[in-house]
Every structure is written in structure tokens, then in C-alpha cells.
């Protein structure tokens, strides 16, 4: 499954608990937009899957994935820890052997209630292993891990970090204010629709193009505020050009691929010669 659902993952730091609360809420609220904007998994086994992001559709149907409603709230470290403790264990590792989690929760492990391992208690490594098997759209480790983007070409791979860096690092408060009226039920509905509808996904009565175009402006201001100058003498805003092109043309990479595939019915024509 991992080989067939390749994604671009992004790790971003936080400075304080309050900083984490803000960044995590924003990152999770942007998941439907991220799915729509970075969609690039439409062809499956040489056929049009009828989804723009088949990868996202697959992960939404797993028992350990998804976008928990609590992630759209102001979740702090304690609430996230409670979420982790209440999450079923996928597997245990003891003496270099892997054992089934058997529907135990990590809280059972913490309380020494797992008979199969003689009621032993978990180590930090055991907690790290458990955290690595929570496949939500975003998750907390020593950093915030963003996981909702499809893998794509070089321009797109650079654009993702630039977009989220501009918002979460450069212009966090303005971005949060912009999304402050979004309702959880609308976000969750958009999350379900985005893999198939892409930029046409409805959120609060407007399509993704409206929301993303405004967020791109906020991200651009954030990157300009950071003013990180590269060897070329330009700042990070240049990496947003690919996303602006998608919005201006109203065509994601997935849509472009579907159009070419529909015309030629040949995967080879999707690659530059």
C-alpha cells in the first residue's frame, strides 16, 4: 500500500505549546485544500480512477487514517496525548519480534495491562513506534508532520513547503483569522469531497479556487516577511509560482494528466520525451 500511495510529507517546527495549537489547527483546517491543490494520483493501473487524488481516497478509508474532528479544534499537548493513549495499538515489538496489538490501546500498555508481554511497561521507543503507526492527515511527533499532499514534480515538491511555510511560519495569525469562520462539519464534508472534486470542492459556499487564491496571497506575504534570500538572489515566493499557475489555469496536475490520458490512452504520453 505504501508503494502505491506515494505522498509528499512536510515537517514543520513549533516553538511553544500555544504555537503548536495554532499551527496544528491551521494545518488540519487546510487538509481539504491541500488534497485539492496537490492532487496527482488520478490514473490507477492504466485506467482513469475517476478521482483526482486516488491516494487520498484510499487513505480516507483506512482505520488508522483520516481527519479526526478533534484536530479541527484548539488541541493542546494534553489533549493530543489523550488521543494517542486512546488509539489502538497496531503492533508491539518485544525482543525483536512483532506481536499483534489485539485491539489494545496504548493506555493499556501504560497501565501494564497487556498479558501477552507479561504486563511490561512501554519505553520511549515503544511510544515512538506507536506514534509512527497513527496515519492521520497530520500528526505530532517532535514536530508537526503534514501528510495530505500527493507526490508530484519538482516545482510542486518545492511549492508545498513554500505554501505552508508562508502560512505557518510567516503569517500564522492572518491565516487563522482568514479561516476563523470555517465550520467543522463543512471542513469534514470538503475533506470527503476533495479527492474526487478537487478544485471544484465546495467549502462554506465557495470553491477551492477562491479559498486557495486568497491563502496564496497570505502565504506570499509570509514568505516576503521571512525574506530568506537564496543563492539566486530571490526569496522563497518564487516557489509559489507553480501553485499560482494551477489556480489561474484552474487545472491541477491530476486534471492535466486526465486530459492527456483521455486523449492518448497511453501512459507514455504523460512523460516528457
Give the predicted meaning of each segment.
Residues 1-139:
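Loop-rich catalytic cores of soluble enzymes, especially ATP-dependent carboxylate-amine ligases
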Residues 28, 41, 45, 164, ...:
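Residue-level signal for alpha-helical context at structural boundaries
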Residues 50-57, 186-189, 237-251:
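Amphipathic alpha-helical surface "interface" segments used
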Residues 72-93, 209-236:
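An exposure/low-complexity boundary signal
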Residues 105, 207, 252-253:
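Short, structural beta-strand-to-alpha-helix junction motif
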Residues 137-139, 143-232:
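Substrate-recognition/cap regions that form aromatic- and gly/pro-loop-enriched pockets
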Residues 219-273:
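C-terminal amphipathic alpha-helical interaction region
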Amino acid at each position: 500500500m505504501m508503494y502505491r500511495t506515494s505522498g509528499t510529507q512536510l515537517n514543520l517546527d513549533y516553538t511553544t505549546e500555544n504555537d503548536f495549537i495554532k499551527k496544528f489547527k491551521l494545518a488540519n483546517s487546510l487538509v481539504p485544500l491541500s488534497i485539492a491543490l496537490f492532487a496527482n494520483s488520478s490514473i490507477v493501473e492504466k485506467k482513469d480512477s475517476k478521482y483526482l487524488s486516488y491516494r487520498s481516497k484510499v487513505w480516507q478509508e483506512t482505520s488508522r487514517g483520516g481527519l479526526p474532528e478533534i484536530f479541527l479544534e484548539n488541541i493542546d499537548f494534553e489533549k493530543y496525548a489523550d488521543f494517542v493513549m486512546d488509539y489502538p495499538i497496531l503492533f508491539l515489538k518485544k525482543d525483536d519480534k512483532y506481536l499483534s496489538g489485539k485491539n489494545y490501546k496504548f493506555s493499556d500498555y501504560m497501565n501494564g495491562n497487556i498479558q501477552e508481554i507479561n504486563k511490561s511497561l512501554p519505553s520511549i521507543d515503544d511510544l515512538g513506534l506507536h506514534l509512527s503507526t497513527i496515519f492521520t492527515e497530520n500528526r505530532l511527533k517532535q514536530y508537526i508532520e503534514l501528510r495530505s499532499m500527493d507526490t508530484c514534480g519538482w516545482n510542486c515538491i518545492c511549492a508545498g513547503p513554500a505554501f505552508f511555510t508562508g502560512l505557518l511560519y510567516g503569517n500564522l495569525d492572518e491565516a487563522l483569522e482568514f479561516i476563523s469562520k470555517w465550520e467543522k462539519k463543512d471542513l469534514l464534508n470538503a475533506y470527503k469531497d476533495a479527492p474526487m472534486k478537487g478544485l471544484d470542492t465546495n467549502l462554506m459556499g465557495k470553491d477551492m479556487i477562491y479559498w486557495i487564491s486568497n491563502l496564496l496571497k497570505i502565504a506570499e506575504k509570509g514568505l516576503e516577511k521571512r525574506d530568506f534570500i537564496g543563492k539566486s538572489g530571490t526569496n522563497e515566493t518564487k516557489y509559489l509560482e507553480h501553485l499560482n499557475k494551477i489556480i489561474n489555469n484552474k487545472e491541477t496536475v491530476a486534471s492535466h494528466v486526465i486530459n492527456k490520458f483521455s486523449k492518448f490512452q497511453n501512459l507514455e504520453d504523460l512523460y516528457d520525451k
